[in-house]
Amino acid sequence: YLYAQQRRDGWRDALGEAGIAMRDAWRVNVNCLDYDAGAQAAAALMQLPAGEAPDAIFAVSDTLAVGVVNGLRGAGRRVPHDVAVVGFDDIALAAQIDPPLTTIAQPMRELGETAARLLLRRFADPRASVPGVLLPHRLVVRESG
């Protein structure tokens, strides 16, 4: 998924800007972006040797992050006391889980409008170039991180 790769790249950039050396063991590739994959990824990260497990996890989607929270709980970790968790998308469930999920919100309506406008432009002129568009996101701070 291109968007997952872009979010991963942003995570790497943020670590670099914060002066944190990224460890390959912190990046867990999953085959799908669902709850179970998040829980399994959290369990795998918590099996790293003492001192190597992360104290914060950024998931590329809120659905994965919800699984991460529960996977951490299953590993005996408390969110956010032991491990902070941040998701991406600000789905409705993010505010309803325990603890409520810190997340990055996308402007969903504007995203849909922009996609439709670009698609109509492409239909009108199949040879027209379609620009890359980056819409502003915002951090929604809740209790998980």
Task: Kindly label every feature range from the protein language model.
Residues 1-145:
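Bacterial carbohydrate/catabolite-sensing allosteric modules
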